[in-house]
Amino acid sequence: MRIVCFGDSNTYGYDPRDYFGGRYDAENRWVDLLAKQLDQPTINLGMNGREIPRTGIALPEEAEKLIIMLGTNDVLQGADADTVIARMAHFLDQIKLPHTNILLIAPPPLQRGAWVDSEELIEASIRLSAGYQRLAAERNIPFTDAAVWHVPLAFDGVHFTGEGHRIFAQQLALLLI
């Protein structure tokens, strides 16, 4: 099964300890760890700063499973939870893949940190989970909430720590097995 992981900087593997936007090495990025744990090839389509696309995406031809985790940057850019959820609904409806082959993940909620100084941001990020769960149920798309995995975030309140990547990959692998 060819897995495509589509997301933001946490999917990309951004290392917040590097001022210039460095990346964790492959041994510490959840996408690469997942590939190793499942013994399945994965394609990392994570991108720093990515918000939910307003149109569909061109998936690699060999894509069999699509894992989506987005919404954090939309919240950080000032969108309220209802707007983000509506964007996700529109995006999901544009994807040309059987819905059962998609996994929608609500990202871990933001925490107070160098990039997050507002309770409103944190609350908006928390509200994504229930909205995404509803969208997934309406479309018969598998869903999980990464908040239940207690993924450690770095000092910025946004990005996974190295340990966070390991926990995320392990929990996701258990879900996919």
What feature does the model see in each segment?
Residues 10, 49-51, 109, 150:
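Residue-level detector of flexible, active-site-proximal loop/helix-junction positions
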Residues 37, 56-177:
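Alpha-helical cap/lid subdomain in secreted, periplasmic
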